[in-house]
Amino acid sequence: MPVFHTRTIESILEPVAQQISHLVIMHEEGEVDGKAIPDLTAPVAAVQAAVSNLVRVGKETVQTTEDQILKRDMPPAFIKVENACTKLVQAAQMLQSDPYSVPARDYLIDGSRGILSGTSDLLLTFDEAEVRKIIRVCKGILEYLTVAEVVETMEDLVTYTKNLGPGMTKMAKMIDERQQELTHQEHRVMLVNSMNTVKELLPVLISAMKIFVTTKNSKNQGIEEALKNRNFTVEKMSAEINEIIRVLQLTSWDEDAWASKDTEAMKRALASIDSKLNQAKGWLRDPSASPGDAGEQAIRQILDEAGKVGELCAGKERREILGTCKMLGQMTDQVADLRARGQGSSPVAMQKAQQVSQGLDVLTAKVENAARKLEAMTNSKQSIAKKIDAAQNWLADPNGGPEGEEQIRGALAEARKIAELCDDPKERDDILRSLGEISALTSKLADLRRQGKGDSPEARALAKQVATALQNLQTKTNRAVANSRPAKAAVHLEGKIEQAQRWIDNPTVDDRGVGQAAIRGLVAEGHRLANVMMGPYRQDLLAKCDRVDQLTAQLADLAARGEGESPQARALASQLQDSLKDLKARMQEAMTQEVSDVFSDTTTPIKLLAVAATAPPDAPNREEVFDERAANFENHSGKLGATAEKAAAVGTANKSTVEGIQASVKTARELTPQVVSAARILLRNPGNQAAYEHFETMKNQWIDNVEKMTGLVDEAIDTKSLLDASEEAIKKDLDKCKVAMANIQPQMLVAGATSIARRANRILLVAKREVENSEDPKFREAVKAASDELSKTISPMVMDAKAVAGNISDPGLQKSFLDSGYRILGAVAKVREAFQPQEPDFPPPPPDLEQLRLTDELAPPKPPLPEGEVPPPRPPPPEEKDEEFPEQKAGEVINQPMMMAARQLHDEARKWSSKPGIPAAEVGIGVVAEADAADAAGFPVPPDMEDDYEPELLLMPSNQPVNQPILAAAQSLHREATKWSSKGNDIIAAAKRMALLMAEMSRLVRGGSGTKRALIQCAKDIAKASDEVTRLAKEVAKQCTDKRIRTNLLQVCERIPTISTQLKILSTVKATMLGRTNISDEESEQATEMLVHNAQNLMQSVKETVREAEAASIKIRTDAGFTLRWVRKTPWYQ
């Protein structure tokens, strides 16, 4: 089957597929319509010449290459293309003598398919060889990185740096060229990110090696920390280069990276649990320990971390972990409540505390088992990939030694481990069956090679058979590992809400548990937010979480009993919708407040650490101060990371922003201990320039990463909400300052004033970023003016705070300080107002009745008509046109069967309302009667009805599962598009058109009444609509004043042309198989799967483009000539 992961392959296959599509249509015309097929001798001769040239170049490459895999894989592709070309030539010759020949038509279609498939195989084989060249360079760098461990002198370091530089430059150049060639945007981003990380780490590596050499040669303290820094950097660079190697080998987008992320998350959770277990048990053992102190918080954090692990598990394992967490949480609440009432030493309280302590041990064991199982499966999966890679080299070499057979046996052993851990017996048996077949084939091949017959045709055929079987085994084991994990919910809030909504609307549809997983993810985030809240706020959020949990369980129970469409289920679904909205709003409010607090000052702790590290050797308590500040810095970094993760999970960020936050949080967690180590080296080597430079390098890297994290967090939350939260926090700080002055507490006053200054500076930073992001001159000017005014109020407030702290009883100084504080509040309010200018009331208020004047004067009479003239007739109302089905233009080719069917569906659908919540039976006659009456009276149909049609293909009963994936994808896009009227909005009109066309393609692919021509033409029509969506989206982006939104829109819409081109090629491949009996089921299924995957990607990309275009249209230039009208079909306020 064709693959299109590079622009070169796509550009070659597209014209080939276009020509093949013409041959396919000719074949069908001869087969169905009985038409004579014209003379094809000349075009087939041209194809033959092109194929001969391609094969000649390929054979020359094979003769000169040292790549054994290329030598093995090229000959079968040559044979496939040459055979297909021979069939075409034979078909042309037979048709020349008999234009109606049936065998000739069969040769024509089989040869066409073979040309397309064989050309794809040749191009893919060439491309894989090019990838192996890049991988060899990457592996060379990996090997040289290990040499860093033996560099112990400055001379060796200089030599090492000189040797590493050219190789790194070559790798960077090759990766840059490769990423530009890739068609998968995700792969490009992954390669660029990993390569950028390697580049950033290179100076850190040199610095770490330099400080290690310096401390070792001078025999100073800090060698252990320097060694940790160096090893960390080497391991980090190696991991990124290994990730580059993995991505280079991908030919389709896969979500396989989740396994390593989940393993890493489980390990981190387990480490966190272990570190807090003693503190938690200490609190439980002490009946006099206060509720809410560090010990109780440790228990909450343990349950939180264990809950994260539970969410990563499936089936019984998941239920046990989450059930234990919930039970222990309730028991901890009871213990805390008893202690708050002074009954901590009572037998009931002591017994409960002991039960919680024992329960924590049980929970820890469950978490360890879950982590061990996932790690075992992941390790086996990765081991299989490496061993199969080595085995393929052995299979390609007829004279290979016995080590290749050992690699295959090793891969089979790892696959057996995965089979044993499978919960699904069918999957387990399927893997075990494959193991037996591969083992037998490998033994037979090894015997032939031991007999010196490794180069015989039989041995070569066996080698190819084993290679294919190993690839199939890898696919099966990968699927088994993926199926052992729970359904993955979206990574961002809106995605989870959408998944949850789809399940709530259709609880009886099997969505593989995605909808419920999304709801569980939202509830889990709610619990995490509640853990850092106190008092009634915490109880309120937990109550909302429990309410959503209960309603979800009740709805799922009804659906399981087949009552998902009952009145009770519909009532539950409505309640669950409302509860989810409440939970979402409360979570976002809590998260915004936390971001406002935690991110008000990100760099002071690291600056204080730097001061402690550079303290003079004779400074008092030098070591103790350093340890305290290092602990504060680590704690602060942890808070930043945890809060950023909550912003990613609960904020309004898109997928790329969420992934960016997660990456920066991971980097911060890795860098923090390295910064502390670098600071400790500097502390123990005062005055050492190399130690100082190394610490500065590590510190700057940490600060740069946190600044990036802060920017992404600001993107993830609503700016206006953040400013509101910051303003409220400043008011509270000012109230604390009043209390401090009243109680004569200067330190409390200074703390409050410092907090006010930090929050004000944070607001300035947010405003500065928004000004840089915008190209709207009025907005920039307004925000800049408000920011300048705020900036001028901070220093006077700080000076007034210092003055009043020195003489806190002076009423005059107190008044000056409070006046300064209120000026800051006023300036903050102006910044906030600049982000949300006052809009006129909607609807406008009624006029003042007192201003109305009623008189008895009659209106002047109409002037009489000229004598003898008759009044002209009333002009007819404007003709109502169906935007989805524009009139055919002269010379335009339209897929007639599909369009006729679509028009019939459209006419039928006009009889029914598409407004939600109105049963068809209630509106059928009334709506039609009203519409007919309006038409008869000469009045236009009301605007509400102007584009209320839903093609029947997209109106499947919502209570029935959609088993056709292409149709499901079309419905998903259609649901998104029908939120808006398409009057005056060409993007919405094109999106609806695409949804209809894709629904038609679903019918054609399923073997409906359509033809090969219809399938090919449908794909072309979809591509045409895709081009229109892309063009319009780029126009919107060009006029958008928000740089961030513009970039998002362009990134989404740039995927569409590539995917639509691939759809045309795949449709041609599928068309060559329709009605053919000599195609294997496996080959036909593979073609269908690729077409389905492509269609889903296209629908998703258009859906995202519609959303981003709507967001971009809000920030359109005021002088833009290009506008789109965004009018909701169902207004948000109804």
Swiss-Prot record:
<dbReference type="GO" id="GO:0002162">
    <property type="term" value="F:dystroglycan binding"/>
</dbReference>
<dbReference type="GO" id="GO:0090136">
    <property type="term" value="P:epithelial cell-cell adhesion"/>
</dbReference>
<comment type="subunit">
    <text>(Microbial infection) Interacts via its globular head domain with the central portion of S.flexneri IcsA (also called VirG).</text>
</comment>
<feature type="region of interest" description="C-terminal tail">
    <location>
        <begin position="879"/>
        <end position="1134"/>
    </location>
</feature>
<dbReference type="GO" id="GO:1904813">
    <property type="term" value="C:ficolin-1-rich granule lumen"/>
</dbReference>
<dbReference type="GO" id="GO:0002009">
    <property type="term" value="P:morphogenesis of an epithelium"/>
</dbReference>
<dbReference type="GO" id="GO:0005856">
    <property type="term" value="C:cytoskeleton"/>
</dbReference>
<feature type="modified residue" description="Phosphoserine">
    <location>
        <position position="434"/>
    </location>
</feature>
<dbReference type="GO" id="GO:0005903">
    <property type="term" value="C:brush border"/>
</dbReference>
<dbReference type="GO" id="GO:0061826">
    <property type="term" value="C:podosome ring"/>
</dbReference>
<keyword id="KW-1003">Cell membrane</keyword>
<feature type="modified residue" description="Phosphoserine">
    <location>
        <position position="809"/>
    </location>
</feature>
<dbReference type="GO" id="GO:0005576">
    <property type="term" value="C:extracellular region"/>
</dbReference>
<keyword id="KW-0449">Lipoprotein</keyword>
<feature type="region of interest" description="Interaction with ACTN4">
    <location>
        <begin position="741"/>
        <end position="764"/>
    </location>
</feature>
<feature type="modified residue" description="Phosphoserine">
    <location>
        <position position="579"/>
    </location>
</feature>
<dbReference type="InterPro" id="IPR000633">
    <property type="entry name" value="Vinculin_CS"/>
</dbReference>
<dbReference type="GO" id="GO:0007155">
    <property type="term" value="P:cell adhesion"/>
</dbReference>
<keyword id="KW-0009">Actin-binding</keyword>
<feature type="modified residue" description="Phosphoserine">
    <location>
        <position position="574"/>
    </location>
</feature>
<dbReference type="GO" id="GO:0045121">
    <property type="term" value="C:membrane raft"/>
</dbReference>
<dbReference type="GO" id="GO:1990357">
    <property type="term" value="C:terminal web"/>
</dbReference>
<keyword id="KW-0206">Cytoskeleton</keyword>
<dbReference type="GO" id="GO:0051893">
    <property type="term" value="P:regulation of focal adhesion assembly"/>
</dbReference>
<keyword id="KW-0597">Phosphoprotein</keyword>
<feature type="region of interest" description="Disordered">
    <location>
        <begin position="857"/>
        <end position="887"/>
    </location>
</feature>
<dbReference type="InterPro" id="IPR006077">
    <property type="entry name" value="Vinculin/catenin"/>
</dbReference>
<keyword id="KW-0472">Membrane</keyword>
<feature type="modified residue" description="Phosphotyrosine">
    <location>
        <position position="537"/>
    </location>
</feature>
<dbReference type="GO" id="GO:0044291">
    <property type="term" value="C:cell-cell contact zone"/>
</dbReference>
<dbReference type="GO" id="GO:0034774">
    <property type="term" value="C:secretory granule lumen"/>
</dbReference>
<keyword id="KW-0966">Cell projection</keyword>
<feature type="modified residue" description="Phosphotyrosine">
    <location>
        <position position="822"/>
    </location>
</feature>
<feature type="modified residue" description="Phosphoserine">
    <location>
        <position position="275"/>
    </location>
</feature>
<feature type="region of interest" description="3 X 112 AA tandem repeats">
    <location>
        <begin position="259"/>
        <end position="589"/>
    </location>
</feature>
<feature type="repeat" description="1">
    <location>
        <begin position="259"/>
        <end position="369"/>
    </location>
</feature>
<dbReference type="GO" id="GO:0070527">
    <property type="term" value="P:platelet aggregation"/>
</dbReference>
<keyword id="KW-0677">Repeat</keyword>
<keyword id="KW-0122">Cardiomyopathy</keyword>
<dbReference type="GO" id="GO:0030336">
    <property type="term" value="P:negative regulation of cell migration"/>
</dbReference>
<dbReference type="GO" id="GO:0070062">
    <property type="term" value="C:extracellular exosome"/>
</dbReference>
<dbReference type="GO" id="GO:0090637">
    <property type="term" value="C:inner dense plaque of desmosome"/>
</dbReference>
